[in-house]
Design a protein with these regions (language model features):
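Conserved N-terminal phosphate-binding loop of PLP-dependent enzymes in the Aspartate aminotransferase
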Residues: 1-246
C-alpha cells in the first residue's frame, strides 16, 4: 500500500516486487479520508509505472464517476484508465455497480472470453430504469456547469466563515478541524473528531445534515438551490461562532 500522492512510494513498490504486481487500484480523488485531489503528475506517474511494469492502471470512480464530469475524474484530469469501477451514482442512488475498460481487457469477459461474471442482481430492472433516468438528466446541457457554480459558492462561503478546513474537487467537498491541509492518509489521522462531532450535531440541530464522519465526502446535487447553499453558509457561521472555533 502506498500513500495517495506519493509517487516515489509507488515506484519503490514496483522495484521491490518486480513482476509481481498485477495492477494498481486507486481513487482519482479520495472520498473517505477527506476530499483530496491528485497532485499534478501523480495519476500520470502511476499510470506510466503500471504500463512500464506490465500492470493494469485501475481507477475506482465509485464516488467520482458522473459527479466530477460526464466522463468522471478521467475527463476532468485528462487521463484514461485500463479499467474503471463505477457505483450508484450511475443509477441515481439505486443499487448498481459497473465496470468497463479497454477492449483488449474487456474481451476477456464472458461471453467473448473465458472469465465468467454474473450475480443475482445483475441487470436489475429497477436499477437499470434509475440509471436511464440518471443519464438522461446528467447529459442535459449545463448540469455540470451548475454543479461547479453551486459548489464554488458553498466552498468559498465556508472558507470565508473560517474556523475549519474545507477542501473540494468539483461538487465533492468535506469539512474538518485540525490540519491546515490534507494531501494523504497520514494527514487525515490528525483530524479533530471531537470538534467535528460538536459541529455536526450543532448543524443537525439547525436542520443541516452533513456526513457523520469528518473523513467522508459530501456532494452537491443538481437539485440544490442557491438559497439552500446560502443557508448552509449562514448556519455554519452561527455554529462556528457558537462553538467558539475561531
Amino acid at each position: 500500500v502506498a500513500d495517495f500522492n506519493d509517487l516515489e512510494k509507488v515506484k519503490a513498490l514496483f522495484e521491490q516486487y518486480p513482476g509481481e504486481i498485477a495492477a494498481a487500484i486507486l481513487e482519482p480523488v479520495t472520498g473517505s479520508m477527506g476530499v483530496i485531489a491528485p497532485e499534478p503528475g501523480f495519476l500520470e506517474g502511476v499510470r506510466d509505472l503500471c504500463h512500464a511494469h506490465g500492470a493494469l492502471f485501475i481507477l475506482d470512480e465509485v464516488l467520482t464517476g458522473f459527479r466530477l464530469a460526464k466522463g468522471g475524474a478521467q475527463e476532468r484530469f485528462h487521463i484514461a484508465a485500463d479499467l474503471t469501477c463505477l457505483g450508484k451514482a450511475i443509477s441515481g442512488g439505486l443499487a448498481m455497480g459497473a465496470y468497463g475498460g479497454k477492449a483488449e481487457y474487456m474481451k476477456s469477459v464472458s461471453p467473448t472470453g473465458p472469465i465468467y461474471q454474473a450475480g443475482t442482481y445483475c441487470g436489475n430492472p429497477i436499477s437499470v430504469y434509475g440509471a436511464i433516468a440518471e443519464l438522461e438528466l446528467a447529459f442535459q446541457p449545463g448540469v455540470y456547469e451548475r454543479l461547479e457554480t453551486l459548489s464554488n459558492r458553498l466552498v468559498n462561503g465556508l472558507k470565508e466563515v473560517g474556523g475549519m478546513l474545507v477542501q473540494s474537487v468539483g461538487s465533492m467537498f468535506f469539512i474538518a478541524f485540525g490540519p491546515k491541509q490534507v494531501r494523504n492518509y497520514q494527514d487525515s489521522t490528525q483530524f479533530d473528531y471531537e470538534t467535528f462531532a460538536k459541529f455536526f450535531h450543532a448543524m443537525l440541530d439547525e436542520g443541516i445534515y452533513l456526513p457523520p464522519s469528518t473523513t467522508d465526502a459530501a456532494c452537491i446535487s443538481a437539485v440544490h438551490t442557491e438559497a439552500e447553499i446560502d443557508r448552509v453558509i449562514e448556519t455554519a457561521d452561527r455554529v462556528i461562532k457558537k462553538l467558539k472555533l475561531k
